[in-house]
């Protein structure tokens, strides 16, 4: 099946792409929703649906994976927030519809890779959009045991770093920029102590993937800056602004056509 992958830059969307390929599907394009650059704090958008921290680095995915990348600015807001989603003009879900509609027209996709694990809110809305476009959602991580998933991601050579913290026990000074492998023991400890979701499904943390077996090049962070979003004494919210990045060549672990053209389509 020809598949477009919804990517946030995080570990979950990356690992679900790997699972899609393992199941015999072909990733032919990447799709991402981004905040408006004119917003004062465009790094961190208040959205129920989309991870936006790290969005400045998403363009590198097109070159790293040698795939076309389609991006759309999020124009809507979270308006229809009930358990069942009904098409609602001005809702941010309609931005996803317009994005995938374009990708389907351009790339003739049949399915969509979705990295959702636990959020019914996200699942219901992605399924609504896919049904309207006659696309098959592929969510191989859905309701998997999170400890197992984290272990699998690390074992699968996904190199992802923590770029946002928002939970009791996570310290911006100590944990921003750490890799999943470095954080695994501590995340398991926090899960036992405070009930923290080890994959961050409760919003405890977010990640950005620098390398994985699907990348033909790896992303390298040259400079970054920690930004405090909320200075709560017990659970501060902070994120890492990736201000300087470049790509480095690597030995490709993905058999494929070296002639593949990457390009970015913004709307």
Curated annotation (Swiss-Prot):
EC number, as in UniProt: 6.3.1.14
Enzyme class: ligase
Similarity comment: Belongs to the Diphthine--ammonia ligase family.
Reactions this protein catalyses: diphthine-[translation elongation factor 2] + NH4(+) + ATP = diphthamide-[translation elongation factor 2] + AMP + diphosphate + H(+)
Residues recorded with modification Phosphotyrosine: 97
Keywords assigned: ATP-binding, Ligase, Nucleotide-binding, Phosphoprotein
Gene3D superfamilies associated with the record: HUPs, putative n-type atp pyrophosphatase, domain 2
Species: Rattus norvegicus (Rat)
Pathway: Protein modification; peptidyl-diphthamide biosynthesis
Stored PANTHER family: DIPHTHINE--AMMONIA LIGASE, DOMAIN OF UNKNOWN FUNCTION 71 DUF71 -CONTAINING PROTEIN
Reported function: Amidase that catalyzes the last step of diphthamide biosynthesis using ammonium and ATP. Diphthamide biosynthesis consists in the conversion of an L-histidine residue in the translation elongation factor eEF-2 (EEF2) to diphthamide.
Pfam families, per the entry: Diphthami_syn_2 (PF01902)
InterPro entries membership: Diphthami_syn_dom, DPH6/MJ0570, Rossmann-like_a/b/a_fold
Disulfide topology: none
GO biological process, one term: protein histidyl modification to diphthamide
Keyword Phosphoprotein: yes
Descriptive protein name: Diphthine--ammonia ligase
Keyword ATP-binding: yes
GO MF: ATP binding; diphthine-ammonia ligase activity
SUPFAM superfamilies: Adenine nucleotide alpha hydrolases-like (SSF52402)
């Amino acid at each position: 099946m020809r598949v477009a992958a919804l990517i946030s830059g995080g570990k979950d969307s990356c690992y679900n792409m790997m699972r899609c390929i393992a199941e015999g599907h072909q990733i032919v394009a990447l799709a991402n929703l981004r905040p408006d650059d004119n917003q004062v704090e465009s790094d961190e958008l208040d959205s129920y649906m989309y991870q936006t921290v790290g969005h400045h680095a998403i363009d590198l995915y097109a070159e790293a994976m040698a795939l076309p990348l389609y991006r759309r600015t999020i124009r809507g807001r979270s308006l229809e927030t009930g358990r069942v989603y009904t098409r609602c003009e001005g809702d941010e879900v309609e931005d996803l519809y317009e994005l995938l509609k374009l990708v389907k027209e351009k790339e003739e996709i049949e399915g969509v890779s979705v990295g959702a694990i636990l959020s019914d809110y996200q699942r219901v809305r992605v399924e609504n959009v896919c049904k309207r476009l006659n696309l098959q959602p592929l969510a191989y991580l859905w309701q998997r045991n999170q400890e197992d998933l984290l272990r699998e991601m690390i074992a699968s050579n996904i190199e992802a770093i923590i770029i946002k913290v928002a939970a009791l026990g996570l310290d911006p000074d100590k944990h921003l920029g750490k890799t999943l492998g470095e954080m695994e023991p501590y995340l398991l400890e926090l899960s036992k102590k405070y009930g923290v979701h080890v994959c961050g499904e409760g919003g405890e943390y977010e990640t950005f993937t620098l390398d994985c077996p699907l990348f033909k090049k790896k992303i390298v962070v040259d400079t970054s800056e920690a930004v405090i979003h909320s200075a709560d004494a017990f659970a501060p919210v902070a994120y890492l602004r990736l201000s300087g990045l470049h790509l480095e060549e690597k030995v490709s672990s993905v058999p494929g056509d070296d002639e593949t053209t990457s390009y970015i389509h913004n709307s």
